[in-house]
Amino acid sequence: MKQERYSVLSLNLGKPQTLEYDGKKIETGIMKRPAKSAVMLYRENFEGDGQADLVNHGGPDKAVCVYPAEHYPFWEEFLSRPLSNAAFGENLTVAGLTEENVCIGDVFRLDEAVVQVSQPRQPCVKLAKKFGVKEMVLKVQQTGYTGFYFRVLEEGRVSPGANLELLSRGEKGISVQFANRINYHDAKNLTAIERILSEAALSESWRASFMKKKDRLLPVE
């Protein structure tokens, strides 16, 4: 297999903070800052990082949030403002690794750690609240610029300037882009749903969601 390496432009960490939106206070872990030194990556998160909503964020299948730097120019134009790394609450801002060319089940070495793509990121309302744009979640779904999650196969220290080195490809070759398209735009495509479900590395939450989609499409006996 051809050796593939991708640059981590920024390693971002942050504990939950309180934001105010429409007169209401919310707890969120979306506010992150670039790390200046190496930190440990554990099974469920980076040392010094955290999530407020542990039902929809975090956990073994969503230990590391990744976002492609390639999308930043689009969002800067859409939002009419400059954006810095970590603007989308991602742990890793990466170059060259997008929803189009990364597949569920892909395994990477990240400095001392080993990680695996588990699912696309599912945009939540806190993105809209952070940017003050109500249609933000819908726009992320429409563009497919979601980012994705890693689970941690081997814990280890990660430096801010680390690279992602591809070790193996997902068995079924299901790109994050493909999974997003079926989830948001073609949810009655039974053949595609069954293909996605055939990927053993798919996260538990996305597997449950696609099983529900499949059950709705099967004839009632």
From Swiss-Prot:
Entry-linked Pfam families: MOSC, YiiM_3-alpha
Entry's Gene Ontology molecular function annotations: molybdenum ion binding; oxidoreductase activity; pyridoxal phosphate binding
InterPro entries, alphabetized: Benzoxazolinone_Detox_Enz, MoCF_Sase_C, Pyrv_Knase-like_insert_dom_sf, YiiM-like_3-alpha_domain
One cellular component term from this protein's GO annotations in UniProt: cytosol
Origin: domain of life: Bacteria
MOSC domain location: 33-167
SUPFAM superfamilies: PK beta-barrel domain-like
Protein known as: Uncharacterized protein YflK
UniProt organism field: Bacillus subtilis (strain 168)
Gene that encodes the chain: yflK
